């Protein structure tokens, strides 16, 4: 029997973003090719976070993330709870939650009217029907990838961009590229696994 191929989960998440942009008008402004998805460290009880990288023409002192020559405008970081605690539905909800923060201009900034401090509980009320619609339309292959139970692969930072570039410091790199990312293993524990659990 041929071994089961481990999914590239960060690639699958980008595919979800691209698919949602085609199927839901509310996400039509998204361009998955300009969004870098990575697995990262824990941040309190967060499932995931989004970081705006600013417009293409940015002030001096801000790092640039450029992958295969294409400048990234956002970074979505999937936190350990997304991999080890979440169900399939929660994983999809987290992805759509983070990209719902993106500005309609898709210019490397966040939507000023969709901050938690502005909307509070209304944010979830607006997002919930979008998640429900997309869950009904997600392709089987993406459902399978996000339901994976076992070891998957994910892009991770080998060297993580800081908030700013400061001269004279080793971490003050101006441009980050695919050279500063690697594809490594991550353990996924799915509460409602769609694939047979594997011991690793």
Please place each PLM-identified region on the residue numbering:
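Active-site recognition of the HExxH zinc-binding catalytic motif
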Residues: 91-105
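Short pre-active-site segment immediately N-terminal to the catalytic Zn-binding motif
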Residues: 78-94
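A short acidic, glycine/proline-enriched capping/turn motif at secondary-structure boundaries
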Residues: 44, 82-85, 101
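Metalloprotease/metallohydrolase-associated module, dominated by Zn2+-dependent proteases
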Residues: 7-72, 76, 105-200
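N-terminal regulatory modules of eukaryotic gene-expression and nucleic-acid-associated proteins
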Residues: 2-3
């Amino acid at each position: 029997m041929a071994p089961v191929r481990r999914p590239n989960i960060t690639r699958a998440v980008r595919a979800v973003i691209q698919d949602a942009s085609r199927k839901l008008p509310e996400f039509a402004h998204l361009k998955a090719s300009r969004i870098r998805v990575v697995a990262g460290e824990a941040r309190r009880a967060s499932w995931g976070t989004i970081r705006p990288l600013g417009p293409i023409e940015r002030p001096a002192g801000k790092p640039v993330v450029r992958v295969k020559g294409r400048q990234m405008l956002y970074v979505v970081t999937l936190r350990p709870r997304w991999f080890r605690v979440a169900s399939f539905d929660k994983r999809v909800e987290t992805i759509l939650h983070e990209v719902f923060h993106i500005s309609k201009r898709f210019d490397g900034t966040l939507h000023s009217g969709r901050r938690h401090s502005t909307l509070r509980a209304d944010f979830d009320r607006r997002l919930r029907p979008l998640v429900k619609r997309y869950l009904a339309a997600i392709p089987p292959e993406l459902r399978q990838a996000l339901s994976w139970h076992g070891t998957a692969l994910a892009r991770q930072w080998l060297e993580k961009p800081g908030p700013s570039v400061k001269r004279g410091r080793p971490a003050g790199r101006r441009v980050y590229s695919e050279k500063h990312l690697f594809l490594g293993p991550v353990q996924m524990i799915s509460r409602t696994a769609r694939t047979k659990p594997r011991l690793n």
